[in-house]
A protein has these predicted regions:
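Rossmann-fold cofactor-recognition segment
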Residues: 2-15
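Hydrophobic/aromatic anchor residues within beta-strands of the central parallel beta-sheet
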Residues: 7, 51, 74, 109-112
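NAD(P)H-binding glycine-rich loop region in Rossmannoid oxidoreductase-like domains
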Residues: 12-53
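SDR active-site strand-loop-helix element
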Residues: 30-36, 74-79, 112-114
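NAD(P)-cofactor binding segment of oxidoreductase domains
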Residues: 44-73
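Active-site Tyr-X1-5-Lys
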Residues: 61-71, 85-112, 120-134
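A conserved pocket-lining segment of Rossmann-fold NAD(P)-dependent short-chain dehydrogenase/reductase
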Residues: 127-149, 153-156, 161-183, 225
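Mid/C-terminal beta-alpha module of Rossmann-like enzyme folds, strongest
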Residues: 164-235
Length: 235
């Protein structure tokens, strides 16, 4: 790690962040990644208020602060759910994009819309790995299709937006229809990659019973797939 790589345990919304910015700036690039990215963060009014505070209001305050000493480039991460949003999370990120674009005349700002980042923290595929570590059956919707990018691809997208983007640009991965995957197909592929044979069960209880009966050397792994209207996935 380079000697000039410094981290601080500070939230972008903390008053100490403003003091840090004024004391240590100006900066070449400011990349803003703080966000609520889960649809399931809409579970109650307090969660929604926290989401709007983090995704919209704190971003607007950060933009006001940056006007004091504008960086050469400002980047803010968004989500594919900001396109024609159908939930509060997507709408909050759309509002964030509008706020960023409103400052484009004074700040060279870009953003990037992600698809789901495969196996990122809090995602359903990451939950598969946690269940495997606990010797638990995998459970997933079989009728939900999603686009995915790898963590490496998501990082490359951010770098491209930071380095090559023009003010007001919104970057997004160009993915085709055949690249959409179901969570059940991801679970099957993961198990097969690890040397296991997925065994489909008719219920979650049946899957748990089978998991409890399998020995450590058994190559079978119980799975339960179901139809669902939403996955609560992160974008």
């Amino acid at each position: 790690i380079p000697a000039d790589y410094i981290t601080y345990p500070v939230s972008v919304g903390d008053p100490v962040f403003e003091r840090l910015f004024r004391a240590e700036g100006p900066f070449d690039i400011v990349a803003h990644f703080a966000a609520h990215k889960h649809v399931r963060s809409e579970k109650d009014r307090y969660s929604i208020e926290a989401m709007l505070e983090n995704n919209v209001l704190s971003t607007a305050r950060l933009l006001d602060l940056l006007l004091e000493s504008p960086p050469e480039h400002f980047f803010c991460v968004s989500t594919d759910k900001a396109a024609n949003p159908v939930n509060v999370m997507g709408a909050s990120k759309k509002l964030m994009e509008e706020a960023v674009l409103a400052y484009a005349a004074e700040l060279p700002a870009t953003t990037a819309r992600f698809a789901n980042v495969a196996f990122s923290n809090g995602s359903l595929p990451a939950g598969f790995l946690e269940r495997l570590a606990k010797h638990q059956p995998l459970s997933a919707p079989s009728d939900v299709l999603r686009y995915f990018v790898s963590p490496e691809e998501s990082g490359q997208l951010c770098l491209l937006a930071c380095i090559t983007g023009e003010p007001g640009d919104i970057f997004f991965p160009r993915l085709e229809q055949p690249q959409m995957l179901t969570f059940s197909s991801i679970a099957d592929a993961l198990l097969e990659r690890l040397g296991y044979e997925p065994v489909r069960c008719a219920s979650e209880d049946e899957a748990r019973e089978l998991a409890a009966s399998l020995g450590p050397e058994d190559a079978r792994w119980p799975v339960y797939y179901f139809e669902s209207d939403t996955s609560g996935e992160k974008g």
